[in-house]
Every structure is written in structure tokens, then in C-alpha cells.
């Protein structure tokens, strides 16, 4: 199965992508992981991407597309993959179509995890991270035993600047503006299956599994 997993920031997409890839016995391909691998290995593409990242600029599509194509061309992708974080725009989706056609592959499903914005904001704004060990808590859903202190090491818990409400709202607005045309692109081809991401994690996992089964 060749699958794209979509979902807004805070939807638990990364976790579900790893679980789905494990269930299917196929690789989980995250663009974040690809970027880090190329940059840490100092590949020509990695060096080019690093120049943009270090300058605080958006990495151009041709660089991102080339990195993704390099990964999809590896033998373990022949029988399937779970793409996480790509494509983000219809332009990238068209580039992906060309890559897959060249490689003799085709998409089977686009799974969209849908979560109300209010819940995504609540999840992010309530998140707290330990300064010492990096453990993550939530003031409502997973609070520490002692407020402001890590259960594991006693370190101070803090709110990341990215988790402030204004910044979360900006990320969500950007996601929606990019994703609406992308979803339409795939809906016109009958590939999109939407699951509710505002349920317990196990139920979301089960619904994704059913969506994949229905796409075979």
C-alpha cells in the first residue's frame, strides 16, 4: 500500500504514521527525517537545504522533491510506504505523481486525520515540556503529579514558545490554506478517506486501519 497520511499540527499524525507503517510492514517516510538525514550526512542536497534553513528561508520545492524522490527510489518502497509531511501543496502533489510514474508506483490512499481547531489549540497550549529530560505533559490530559515539576527527574516544566495560542493559530491557518486545495486535488481522484482525530488514540488507529482496508 502506498499511502499519504495528512493531518493538522497536533493531530497525532506522526504517531499514527509510525503505527500504520508498522502494521503494514512498510517504511514510514517523514520529510523531517529525510531533511535531517541529508543535512547530517552532508549530501549535496543536504548542503543546499541547510543553506536555506540556516538563513531562515523556505526550502524550494525542487530540493524537497529531489530528496523525496531519492527516498522513494529505494527498494523498500516498492511494496509500499506511509508518506508523512509531503506533499503539502498541489504543486508538490503533481511532482509526486511524476516521481511515482517514473518509479512504476501509484498511490492507493490519502488518509486525512480531521481534528477541530479548538481541540488542536487546547492540546498545544496545554503542553508542557521538561527543561531537563524533555518529557512531555499536558495540564489537562496528562498532568504531572506536582504542578510545574517533571515526574521523572523533578525538572522544571515550561511551555514552548511555539505552543502559545497566537503561534498555534498561525500554524493552523497556514495548514488550512495549503491543505484545502491539496485535499480537493486528491478527492477528485477518489483517494481521500477522512477519519476523526478527536477520539481516543486507539480508536483513531483502528479507523485508519479500516480506511486502509477499504482502499485495497
Curated annotation (Swiss-Prot):
Binding-site residues, ATP: 10-15, 127, 136-137, 199
Region annotation LID: where it falls in the sequence: 126-163
Protein name as annotated: Adenylate kinase
SUPFAM superfamilies on file: P-loop containing nucleoside triphosphate hydrolases (SSF52540)
Database matches in InterPro entries: Adenyl_kin_sub, Adenylat/UMP-CMP_kin, Adenylat_kinase_CS, Adenylate_kinase_lid-dom, P-loop_NTPase
Region described as NMP: spans on this chain: 30-59
Subcellular location: Cytoplasm
Residues that, per the record, bind Zn(2+): 130, 133, 150, 153
Family (UniProt): Belongs to the adenylate kinase family.
Molecular function GO terms recorded: adenylate kinase activity; ATP binding; zinc ion binding
Transmembrane segments: none
Function: Catalyzes the reversible transfer of the terminal phosphate group between ATP and AMP. Plays an important role in cellular energy homeostasis and in adenine nucleotide metabolism.
EC numbers for this chain: 2.7.4.3
Keywords: ATP-binding, Cytoplasm, Kinase, Metal-binding, Nucleotide biosynthesis, Nucleotide-binding, Transferase, Zinc
GO process annotations (BP): AMP salvage
Record GO cellular component, one term: cytoplasm
UniProt superkingdom: Bacteria
Major subcellular site: cytoplasm
Amino acid at each position: 500500500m502506498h499511502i499519504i497520511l495528512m493531518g493538522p499540527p497536533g493531530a497525532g499524525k506522526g504517531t499514527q504514521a509510525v503505527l500504520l507503517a508498522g502494521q503494514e510492514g512498510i517504511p514510514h517516510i517523514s520529510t523531517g527525517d529525510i531533511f535531517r538525514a541529508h543535512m547530517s550526512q552532508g549530501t549535496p542536497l543536504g548542503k543546499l537545504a541547510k543553506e536555506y534553513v540556516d538563513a531562515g528561508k523556505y526550502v524550494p520545492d525542487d530540493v524537497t522533491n529531489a530528496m523525496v524522490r531519492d527516498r522513494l527510489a529505494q527498494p523498500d518502497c516498492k511494496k509500499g510506504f506511509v508518506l508523512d509531511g509531503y506533499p503539502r501543496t498541489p504543486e508538490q502533489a503533481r511532482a509526486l505523481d511524476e516521481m511515482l510514474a517514473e518509479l512504476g508506483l501509484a498511490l492507493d490512499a490519502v488518509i486525512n486525520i480531521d481534528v477541530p481547531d479548538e481541540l488542536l489549540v487546547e492540546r498545544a497550549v496545554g503542553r508542557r515540556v521538561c527543561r531537563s529530560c524533555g518529557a512531555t505533559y499536558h495540564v489537562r490530559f496528562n498532568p504531572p503529579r506536582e504542578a510545574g515539576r517533571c515526574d521523572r527527574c523533578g525538572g522544571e516544566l515550561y511551555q514552548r514558545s511555539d505552543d502559545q495560542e497566537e503561534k498555534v493559530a498561525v500554524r493552523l491557518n497556514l495548514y488550512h490554506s495549503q491543505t484545502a486545495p491539496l485535499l480537493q486535488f486528491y478527492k477528485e481522484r477518489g483517494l481521500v478517506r477522512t477519519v476523526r482525530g478527536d477520539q481516543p488514540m486507539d480508536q483513531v488507529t483502528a479507523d485508519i486501519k479500516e480506511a486502509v482496508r477499504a482502499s485495497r
